């Protein structure tokens, strides 16, 4: 598997050297922010969003900016929701988590995450609607409205239920 991965990586690196550079730059920045135990969730999630923006906009065409915006918002969504869902384990394992300052105020954290994710999903919806997706629009809307939204709400409720046990 590693050989196949390496070959794919080398091919992508040759085909998209600027993308590879930008992705690596954002990965390095993310690593630095996490090592510094940065708790500014906007700065950290924006960095992961920038990384995902590069992944989503692989070619320069009329959809590049919209796809960058989709990737950026998906990246922010993933980073924030993952940090929220992992907080208990990160506290227990003494691992980095940007939400560590909320360890004693879960209700405030839940409200903050709910607000952040709601704004991100609103922007994501606008970005997706700006794309010409006639063929797969229904599938993409189902993923966005059912999958992504319900996953986020489930994690918020699940964390609350876990806390109340």
What label would you give each PLM region?
Residues 1-48, 54-69, 76, 80-118, ...:
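Acidic catalytic motifs of isoprenoid enzymes
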């Amino acid at each position: 598997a590693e050989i196949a991965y390496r070959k794919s990586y080398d091919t992508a690196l040759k085909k998209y050297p600027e993308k590879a550079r930008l992705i690596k730059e954002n990965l390095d920045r993310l690593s630095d922010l996490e090592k510094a135990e940065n708790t500014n969730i906007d700065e950290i999630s924006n960095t992961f969003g920038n990384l995902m923006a590069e992944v989503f906009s692989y070619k320069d065409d009329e959809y590049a900016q919209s796809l960058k915006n989709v990737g950026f918002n998906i990246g922010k969504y993933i980073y924030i929701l993952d940090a929220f869902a992992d907080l208990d384990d990160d506290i227990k394992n003494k691992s980095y988590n940007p939400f560590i300052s909320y360890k004693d105020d879960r209700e405030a954290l839940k409200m903050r995450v709910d607000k952040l994710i709601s704004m991100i999903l609103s922007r994501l919806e606008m970005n997706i609607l700006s794309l010409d997706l006639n063929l797969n629009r229904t599938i993409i809307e189902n993923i966005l409205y059912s999958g992504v939204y319900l996953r986020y709400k489930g994690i918020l409720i699940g964390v609350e239920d876990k806390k109340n046990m």
